[in-house]
């Protein structure tokens, strides 16, 4: 059965390989299953996040081992998460293994250095992760990606490394990150500080196809057509439908929208709109109306 992560590898794929290896090697019983999630460092939850993000289904605890973002309903993007994602993964894997692991114990630990690989699955390309994360605002996926950036930069895969890791990755772009504070990969922390101009400059790189940023452009939700913008830019703003490509943002203290506008007159505009404070859902409509005005104005607004 497909989860929200379409065509991703499944535990059953791994279990089939393990059972095949066991059959070929005369193994009839698995006594112990050890779950190694040490790729990511603790804590699994950022101190400034509200636990309602977890119980209401917007964010899982950040562990390197979990199944379908630890969703109660793997087919629903927004679905309650638990406080035991690693243990849940172990439970599901034991079940997938079937009779051979019926009496196996399951515990968390670290992979021994002399271990032999008997089965493996590989994730989809990171480009697929990025596109899905952008389309539906998958917070868990965003946290994973941030930690992979940290690992690539030679840092620990932890909340404490994300700020430096992202700034280090942005160095070649020449974007000025002075004053930028990044507490997490998902943007859920209200202690993050990223000025709108920083996002606008980033979107300029996306528009121009800097490095491999084209994957970001391909993943941006489209006004009234896809992802988190599929139900927005209707009514009086319908003329902007299909012409605004942008990432949505929402926490209790703000709504944001940042991206690219293919304006009515053909001009490409980069924008970032923040509505901060004690905001209501109606702020999204106001943001959309302002972005639509940008679309209509086109080159009159361009500062280049």
Please report, for each region that a protein language model flagged, where it lies by residue.
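Solvent-exposed coil/turn segments that connect beta secondary-structure elements
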Residues: 1, 38-40, 51-52, 68-72, ...
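Periplasmic/cell-envelope proteins involved in peptidoglycan metabolism and beta-lactam response
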Residues: 1-71, 289-292, 296-297
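Envelope-exposed proteins and targeting segments
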Residues: 29-31, 59-63, 102, 141, ...
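Structural recognition of the beta-strand scaffold that forms the well-ordered cores
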Residues: 32-35, 64-66, 132, 141-144, ...
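Short, glycine/proline-biased beta-turn/loop segments that scaffold the active-site neighborhood
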Residues: 35-46, 50, 103-116, 222-224
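Short Gly/Pro-enriched turn/cap motifs at secondary-structure boundaries
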Residues: 54-56, 83, 247-251
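A small/polar active-site loop signature that marks catalytic segments
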Residues: 56, 71-217
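Small-residue-rich helix-loop
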Residues: 150-304
């Amino acid at each position: 059965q497909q989860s929200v992560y379409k065509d991703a590898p499944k535990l059953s794929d791994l279990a089939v390989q393990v059972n095949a290896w066991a059959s070929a090697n005369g193994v009839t019983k698995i006594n112990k299953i050890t779950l190694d999630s040490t790729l990511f460092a603790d804590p699994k939850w950022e101190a400034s996040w509200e636990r309602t993000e977890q119980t209401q289904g917007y964010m899982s605890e950040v562990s390197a081992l979990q199944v379908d973002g630890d969703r109660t309903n793997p087919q629903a993007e927004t679905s309650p998460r638990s406080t035991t994602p690693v243990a849940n993964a172990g439970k599901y894997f034991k079940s997938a293994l079937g009779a051979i692991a019926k009496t196996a114990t399951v515990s968390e630990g670290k992979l021994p250095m002399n271990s032999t690989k008997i089965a493996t699955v590989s994730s989809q390309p990171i480009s697929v992760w990025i596109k899905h994360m952008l389309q539906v605002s998958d917070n868990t996926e965003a946290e994973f990606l941030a930690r992979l950036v940290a690992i690539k930069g030679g840092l620990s895969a932890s909340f404490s490394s994300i700020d430096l890791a992202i700034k280090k990755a942005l160095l070649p772009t020449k974007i000025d990150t002075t004053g930028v504070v990044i507490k997490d990969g998902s943007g859920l922390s209200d202690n993050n500080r990223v000025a709108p101009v920083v996002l606008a400059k980033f979107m300029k790189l996306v528009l121009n196809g800097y490095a491999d940023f084209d994957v970001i452009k391909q993943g941006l939700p489209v006004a009234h057509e896809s992802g988190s913008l599929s139900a927005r830019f209707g009514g009086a703003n319908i003329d902007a439908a299909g012409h605004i490509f942008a990432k949505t943002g929402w926490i209790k203290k703000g709504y944001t929208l940042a991206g690219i506008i293919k304006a009515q007159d053909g001009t490409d505009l980069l924008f970032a709109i923040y509505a901060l404070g004690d905001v209501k859902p109606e702020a999204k409509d106001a943001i959309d109306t302002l972005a639509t005005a940008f679309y209509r104005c086109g080159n009159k607004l361009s500062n280049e």
